[in-house]
Amino acid sequence: METCQEKLKISNDEMKKIVETNKNPKKKLTQAMRIHLREKEFKNWCDLKSKGKGVETFKDCKEVNKRIMEKRGLTNTEWIQILKMNGQVAPVRALHGRGQDNRCRHCDEIETLGHVLGFCDRGYLLRNTRHNTVRTLIADEFRRLKWNVYEEVHCINPSRSTQRIDILIYKNKNDKSYILDPTIRFEAGGNQSEDVNIEKKAHYDSVIPYFKEKYKLADIEVIGLFIGARGTITVDFENFRTKFDLSKEMRNNIALSVIKSSVQILQHHTYNL
């Protein structure tokens, strides 16, 4: 065991901690050491300034990560592109060593992966398709559970201009109803999920009276749902899913559709496919 510890470069203090935190006495110590090394490397990855951007989001839903790493529903080409996106080594111009010009090949912004997947006009229609697919998956799941569901509902705000919400759901008009806004953004770390929820609540707050009046609803809550552009599912999304008893299949389909669409956006941007 000492030889193994030495070869793996595990310090005595680390080894002591591994032994103390090994909650399952039946688990082999070598397995506990592997877990420790994996978590250590993940932390090192998260600490990287560029390549670790948003990586901590991957730890929130390991089931989805496992499905992606097992290539479920993915072609070999898609899987390779996903690995490149996750490691921040996709062929975008802002990547160190790609060339002197880091400007986008379709606009004048710096061509980062986040720009390609979330902002560049080149992928506008594909991003809309990616979003609409997620919206429909969520709406159909609520329909399966016998909720009243409305998609792409137009409304008028207090300034008399038109707005549109993604999903309106309710079961009983006297109970709480919900405006749902799934939002796909590139994982950047921090409290993105909470920030999206706060942002959407503020954005739709002014139209709540309109929907109360039109649909005769007693109470409406706005929920902003953050989904990572690299197919990550957050703790907040999982809490939302379990609160409404939505299926894991829906969650898995959302993650798969998002990551496949992001691959398509990247390839369309870089290779005109």
Regions found by a protein language model. Name each.
Residues 162-165, 177, 182-273:
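Catalytic cores of nucleic-acid endonucleases
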Residues 82, 104, 115, 120, ...:
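Mobile genetic element proteins and their domesticated derivatives, centered on retroelements
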Residues 1-93, 99, 267:
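Extended C-terminal regions of large enzymes
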Residues 109-112, 143, 147, 172, ...:
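Short amphipathic alpha-helices and their capping/turn residues within compact interaction modules
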Residues 98-139:
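Short Cys/His-based metal-binding microdomains
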Residues 95-100, 137-184, 198, 226:
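Active-site metal-binding core of divalent-cation-utilizing nuclease and nuclease-like domains
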Residues 72-73, 94-97, 123-130, 189-196:
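Conserved, non-catalytic sequence blocks in retroelement Pol enzymes and Pol-derived host proteins
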Residues 11-14, 25, 29, 75-78, ...:
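Alpha-helical interaction elements in eukaryotic regulators
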